[in-house]
Amino acid sequence: MDEWLAEFIKRTILKLPFSETVTILKAWGFLTESELQTFTFRYPKDVTATEVVRLCEAKNATVDHAAALDLVFNHAYSNKKSWTVYQMSKPSESENDLFDASEFKLQFKKSIHAVSKNVTLNFKQFGEALWIRIAWGTHNTRPNQYKATFAVYHSQTPYVFITGLGKACRPLMCQALVIAAKYSQIQEMELKSRCLESLKDIVFKRFNQPFSSHHSIPHEKALIPKIVDPRVIYENMREKDRVSHLTRETFGEGPLPKLELASYKLETMFRAESIMDGNLTAVNEPFRCVVKFSSPHLLEAIRSLAPAGIAEAPISTLLSCIPHKARNSFKITEKRGMHPTSSQTTNF
């Protein structure tokens, strides 16, 4: 086994939490149960990693075996990467009812190898999702196993979740996907997150949907608190009930998908009644700025704003629409053909 391959396997093992090492190695499937029992997993982790490499050398592990281990690791710890959603559209005329995984892999490989043969390409099925791993190389260098691209495709859906895709490789990757999946177009959605499962929940509409109501506020009867003790002072109970109702109506009551960031790009022109109002109005270039919101769990944070008294209820649709529009990056511009002294935000 080449030295660089042994080093790659060792580094992959060292990235594993010590308590999960055995679980990941079993999921890998390259080493048998009896082989795993021949040594003791112990600190420091370097000792365990060296022992695993020794077993791999004895079994003549190849780069495909190492790539399979990397796939298992990244599937188990997918939240260590930032994922972007791509959406395919306009299915081709060929039948797209039944998904043939073997045919998909064959067509994908053909598309990639037609342009570049110096790549490491591997597939692994995890439940309903087909994981694709590509390590890209050049004419002069071997494929970089440490900067591989990962794509997750659910058959018979137009969505692909991709991480680690450089601009130079994007056209080839997208072309291979649409050919293998029998679509004709693909585009990047404005939706990103470290939580792969939350991205799936959003595009597959698996998250808790807000309930519909025919009333903008709760019934009057629901707003009247029961007086248990006349000496108790109820402060703003009606307002609290109204905020609670609007929050449930907007976000629902169940858990929300986990996103970490939302960005809003503003592009507008300065308006004035006359050119004497300032030099900025005479500039043809629009004014641009970016506002970003970040949180370990952004949607839950937004849902808590009104009940906490930080924001008015209902929350602005610019924030509440994120899961329903399946995007967390927005561009706010002006409507065309409006009166030169007024503006209105659109395109969100």
From Swiss-Prot:
InterPro entries, per database record: CENP-NAC/CAD_complex, Chl4/mis15/CENP-N
Localization terms from the record: Nucleus; Chromosome, Centromere
Keyword presence, Nucleus: yes
Protein's GO biological process: CENP-A containing chromatin assembly; chromosome segregation
Cellular component terms (Gene Ontology): chromosome, centromeric region; nucleoplasm
Keywords linked to the UniProt accession: Centromere, Chromosome, Nucleus
Keyword match Iron: no
Pfam families given in the database record: CENP-N (PF05238)
Function of the molecule: Probable component of a centromeric complex involved in assembly of kinetochore proteins, mitotic progression and chromosome segregation.
Family per record: Belongs to the CENP-N/CHL4 family.
Name of this chain's protein: Centromere protein N-A
